[in-house]
Amino acid sequence: MELHILEHRVRVLSIARPGLWLYTHPLIKLLFLPCRSRCKFFSLTETPEDYTLMVDEEGFKELPPSEFLQVAEATWLVMNVSHSGSVVQAAGVTKIARSVIAPLAEHHVSVLMLSTYQTDFILVREQDLSVVIHTLAQEFQIYREVGGEPVPVTGDDSSNGFPQIQHGPSPTVHPIQSPQNRFCVLTLDPETLPAVATTLIDVLFYSHSVPKEAASGGPESTSIPFFAFSLIEGYISIVMDAEIQRKFPSDLLLTSSSGELWRMVRIGGQPLGFDECGIVAQIAGPLAAVDISAYYISTFNFDHALVPEDEIGCVIDILQRRQESQASKDP
């Protein structure tokens, strides 16, 4: 397998809902006129709490500072995995759970995930790159993009001075909830983006028909507002509620031949922050063990896994049993 470290240097931001009006113009520019901003990595995710943005440095320049904008301190580098051969595996984050997510958690590297229709992006802090290379060099051929060209990276230069894995206290097992929404994962030909622009602007900025209550209480919670749009290196990916999809022209949105619907597992009872390690691993690992596909989208406050609709009961059971098992071990 190959691990590619892409050229994007990404910032992670949160726009408070009351301040969205201040950012409507720059967001529309990034959504529909990327050539004017030279932004190559743009992701916008609406959650009950806020709007999370992941943008490269060119996109970041478009966003004025304000009291409504929070910016995570770190600059994040973007990686993805290329699988050689045609072995059919579970989709999404599940297929990299053992090879990438678990080893990085063991070496105390905090990761963010952004699954799209096309691929899964792994974001790591720029300052952690040497640890990432050292950790994954035996498992992967690692390449770093320089000027658009992949340049081989070896772990030899970073192999000294790294201690053995220190097994500290078990990571916090965060509570989970499952909103009632049914989601679809879609793509769109960028050339047809203008044809859905009006609907997309309405859904993102003006239409909030889904209840705004955060997923709180029991594991089965009410529906929540959640909409994820990414435009990365010319490829579009959209995650939306199946009810919202009906607002769009059906002939322009593309999905897999099965037309599979997905349910959400929302991770975190309170904002997760960016320093804790192993959050993705505690979800991806158990699902990989039973070969259940999962898309995974990290946001500024909480994490979100999308699993096949017919597997949601099994997934909730697996993750709750893990919670109970961990709780029984804690003093």
Swiss-Prot record:
The modification Phosphoserine is found at S14. GO terms for molecular function: arginine binding; identical protein binding; molecular sensor activity; protein sequestering activity. Phosphorylation at Ser-14 by AKT1, promoting the interaction between CASTOR1 and RNF167. Ubiquitinated by RNF167 via 'Lys-29'-polyubiquitination, leading to its degradation, releasing the GATOR2 complex. Ubiquitination by RNF167 is promoted by phosphorylation at Ser-14 by AKT1. SUPFAM superfamilies: ACT-like. One of its GO terms (biological process) is cellular response to L-arginine. L-arginine binds at S110, V111, G273, I279, V280, T299, F300, N301, F302, D303. GO terms for cellular component: cytosol; GATOR2 complex. It comes from the Eukaryota. It is found in: Cytoplasm, Cytosol. InterPro entries: ACT-like_dom_sf, CASTOR1_ACT-like, CASTOR1_N, CASTOR_ACT_dom, CASTOR_fam, CASTOR_mTORC1. Its main location: cytoplasm. Residues 72-137, 259-320 form the ACT domain. Keywords: Cytoplasm, Phosphoprotein, Ubl conjugation. Functions as an intracellular arginine sensor within the amino acid-sensing branch of the TORC1 signaling pathway. As a homodimer or a heterodimer with CASTOR2, binds and inhibits the GATOR subcomplex GATOR2 and thereby mTORC1. Binding of arginine to CASTOR1 allosterically disrupts the interaction of CASTOR1-containing dimers with GATOR2 which can in turn activate mTORC1 and the TORC1 signaling pathway. Belongs to the GATS family. PANTHER family: CHROMOSOME 1, WHOLE GENOME SHOTGUN SEQUENCE, CYTOSOLIC ARGININE SENSOR FOR MTORC1 SUBUNIT 1. Based on x-ray crystallography data, the protein would be constituted of 4 tandem ACT domains instead of the 2 predicted from the sequence. Forms homodimers and heterodimers with CASTOR2. Interacts with the GATOR2 complex which is composed of MIOS, SEC13, SEH1L, WDR24 and WDR59; the interaction is negatively regulated by arginine. Interacts with TM4SF5; the interaction is positively regulated by leucine and is negatively regulated by arginine. This is Cytosolic arginine sensor for mTORC1 subunit 1. It comes from Mus musculus.
